[in-house]
Structures are given as C-alpha cells and as structure tokens.
From Swiss-Prot:
Residues 129-143 have a biased composition (Low complexity). It comes from the Eukaryota. This is Forkhead box protein R2. Expressed in breast cancer cell lines and primary cancer. The lineage of its organism: Eukaryota, Metazoa, Chordata, Craniata, Vertebrata. It is found in: Nucleus. It comes from Homo sapiens.
Amino acid sequence: MDLKLKDCEFWYSLHGQVPGLLDWDMRNELFLPCTTDQCSLAEQILAKYRVGVMKPPEMPQKRRPSPDGDGPPCEPNLWMWVDPNILCPLGSQEAPKPSGKEDLTNISPFPQPPQKDEGSNCSEDKVVESLPSSSSEQSPLQKQGIHSPSDFELTEEEAEEPDDNSLQSPEMKCYQSQKLWQINNQEKSWQRPPLNCSHLIALALRNNPHCGLSVQEIYNFTRQHFPFFWTAPDGWKSTIHYNLCFLDSFEKVPDSLKDEDNARPRSCLWKLTKEGHRRFWEETRVLAFAQRERIQECMSQPELLTSLFDL
C-alpha cells in the first residue's frame, strides 16, 4: 500500500513517540498476520500468553536522552509510532541519511579486505552499521551478510560430509544448506516471479504428495524455487496464510502422523480442493505458458519449469 499524505512533516514528526493507539487491541493485531498453526500447541499457547501479559505504556512517557544519540527519547514499545523508512529501508543496504564523510552508498554486504591495517576495525564497523536492523525476523541472507568470503571456503566440503542425524541438529543442517545456497547465488539479483501467492500455493501443493503440506513447507518450497523470497520482506508469508484461509481452492486436513512422545497430531496440513485443481489447470498453467521466459529468469532451476507447471 502506497499512501500519499498531504501533511507529511506532521507524520514524520511522530517518529519515536507514543501519541495514540494506547487503546489498540495489540494482542489480536499481532496475531492477524502471524501463522502459528505449524507450531506445537504448547508453543502457540506460550506465544499468546506472552502477548497477553503486555500492557501499553503509561502516559505521559518520561523522555530521556538516548545513550547512542540515535534512538528515540522514550522507551521502545509496541505502541510506539515509527517511520519504517528510517528503521528498515528497503532496496538499500545503506543508512537513509549518512553523514558527510561516512557515505556508505558503495559498501557491499561482503566487506573487502582493507589496504591498510589501521582501517580494518573501522571498515568492519561501517559494514555492520550499514545493514538494516529490525525487530522482526530477518531473512537467512541478511543474518549472514556480515561474514567475509573466507568464512565460506569449506562450506561445500562440509556439505559433502555424511550427516549423522544423532549428532547434527535440524537447525545446523538448515544453516549449512543456506550457507551453500548463499555462495552460489550471492552475486545474482533475483526478480519477483509474475505469479501471485495463490499460484505459488497451488504450485507447491500440486508438486507434493497427496498427504498435503504444512504452512512452513509451502514457504520452503516457494523460497527453494524462487530465490527472490529469501530476501523479500516477510509480508508475502502473511499473504500466503491469508489465501490459505479464505480461498476455496485450499482445504485444511489433520496430519495423520503422530508425535511419538505425546501421541498428538504434529500440525495441520493443506491440500488442493477440486476447485483448486481446476484453477491450477485453467489459470496457473496458462499464465506459466504465456510468461515462460519471465518465470524461468526468476527460478533457481529454470529447467524444472515444464515439470513443475506440467506444461
């Protein structure tokens, strides 16, 4: 959504303040764009409890000077108004308004080795400061963007070593695969595919077994075949969850697999309905045929387009 405001200066002046919204039901607001059905029941209850115990700040808030001179004069909280262009500028790895001598425009996510030893520490600090920071969840590439290329020299060798499931955690496996993916794709800028979220969901469900997929598995499928979503803002996840809940092309089915510890359903899965299969054949495949070249440019493996879309 692109809002065009007449009095922009007034709204910009509210950055870092709590002028209103104290009567806002933040508990319900936070869970509207969130997906928790892929989590265990205990984790869902704990997340709702943590939000439920939060209370809005008392007014008026006590102003205090920021220690670093860059933060707001009040204690940060969920009810604070902020300018997202200042907190997390999109499409740029630089600060929105750098000072005169500290222009970070040409600094890349991977720092180059300095010519002099004296400026090594200063160079690293500038690179870290140039990365956008946010309280929301960052993508894997953003989290690992401050590493130097030398950190990834042995990644391919590590990936080829046999995995011991008893010694290696799932988080470690995921981390290694993401590092390897980053090496192969760090120099390429991916474009957004000409497909909406309902097409992406149908594509993921159509190319997986009939038992269905969880929400997290749909996310993983989308990022695996369309790398644009590795670095895209997390809003696309909320759109996928919205489409799953409100379109008649998808239905939720209970997972038949049981957890061995407490014998409960692991999570809910999603499947294509008859209407979903019809739309895949009449809409998604037709769009893929018409936009074949553009879609292939956005895919990590363009040769799979024919099999994925059943062309």
